[in-house]
Amino acid sequence: MAAARKQNTRKRRVKKNIESGIAHIRSTFNNTIVTITDTHGNALSWSSAGALGFRGSRKSTPFAAQMAAETAAKGSIEHGLKTLEVTVKGPGSGREAAIRALQAAGLEVTAIRDVTPVPHNGCRPPKRRRV
């Protein structure tokens, strides 16, 4: 009558052999999120500055973006990834640092695309800061 052992319900990660993929870099003023997917958009690995333990204003630094890109690249290299297209979205400071970190991790960057959404005079922007 001992307590029943809880079964491990977590699914094991299957190693996929994928040659090329897409790195989606979302760089805001507060954080940088790097997601590496296959060409169909299925996520292989992801990382962000906040997930690595950077908090507050340190989350928005280029160094935090570099570390996030390195962590995501390591996870995708385990799946056999070799070449990448990079799509960058947002105005943050970690854009260039994340791209350089992906190249330094051993991934070949074939294209860099800026997909930052630009409004055709849509929503009213937030009020200007007075510091």
Swiss-Prot record:
Coiled-coil region(s): none
Molecular function in Gene Ontology: rRNA binding; structural constituent of ribosome
Keyword field contains Transmembrane helix: no
Gene Ontology CC terms: ribonucleoprotein complex; ribosome
Annotated keywords: Ribonucleoprotein, Ribosomal protein, RNA-binding, rRNA-binding
GO biological process assignments: translation
Homology family: Belongs to the universal ribosomal protein uS11 family.
Function of the molecule: Located on the platform of the 30S subunit, it bridges several disparate RNA helices of the 16S rRNA. Forms part of the Shine-Dalgarno cleft in the 70S ribosome.
HAMAP family: Ribosomal_uS11
Record protein name field: Small ribosomal subunit protein uS11
Organism expressing this protein natively: Bacillus velezensis (strain DSM 23117 / BGSC 10A6 / LMG 26770 / FZB42) (Bacillus amyloliquefaciens subsp. plantarum)
